[in-house]
Amino acid sequence: MKRVKNNKHAYLIMAHNEIELLKVLLSLLDYERNDIYLHIDAKAEGFEISELMECVKKSKLFIVEPRLDVKWGNFSQIECEYRLLERATPQKYMYYHMMSGVDLPLKTQGEIHQFFDENYGTEYIQFESSELTNEEKNRVSKYHFIAKRKKNIIEKILYRVSLMLQLKIDRTKKSPLEYRKGANWFSITDDLAQYVVKNKKIIEKYFRYTICGDELFLQSLVYSSEYRKNISENNFCDNYETIKYVIDWKRGNPYVFRESDFEQLVSSGQLFARKFSWNLDKRIVEKIK
């Protein structure tokens, strides 16, 4: 793969709470070879843009607006990722890193850039090792007009009726995509980022009115494309080392790291970790900082 002229990285951040933690994240990403693109959920309160700007001295920080009301399981999550990619891709960065506002880097930016310089061309996308379960297939094969985690009794009834009326409907039959699932955090090259943006209409057609499509759309698009060859077989596993992340789903949903986890994190060899909470345990955040 031919290297892009721009050797900078773009960090794409989706934030919705934890203001103090976000400030730490921005300060840890502040580096000459980074630009930072930040989307703040429309529901979020207490974010002072001027305070966030003060966290960045070496990078450029871009606030992506208008702000979306991002809802769990909703297409708005995919739309938010596209907003970030569409804002950043005209600059043709070397790598694009999708993160949430409650993630933190575990290495210095110099070490992170060295890793991606040495492994340029590899796409860091996590795929689950198995194919979709029937429940996961239903997320994309049916129209989910009420994609809420907590539904009231009327919404639950309407939701079940709508699925019953769709027993013979399978949206995936005419789809050009082979569906796969994985984490929605990634590090991808400019070539792939441009391809993802170019194919937005396909994603809109087959992922609008799905549930948790943010865990499926990128994996499905890449798996069905020539970029599949840039994915190592090691990426098809049920851990997050393939995207250089530490995420613990065994102790939580996912687990929020505490101060007692510090040695485990720094000795993991990974570049990033998810997730943290300034309100729950700021000591681990201060140690990483």
Regions found by a protein language model. Name each.
Residues 1-289:
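ER/Golgi luminal nucleotide-sugar-dependent glycosyltransferases, focusing on the catalytic module
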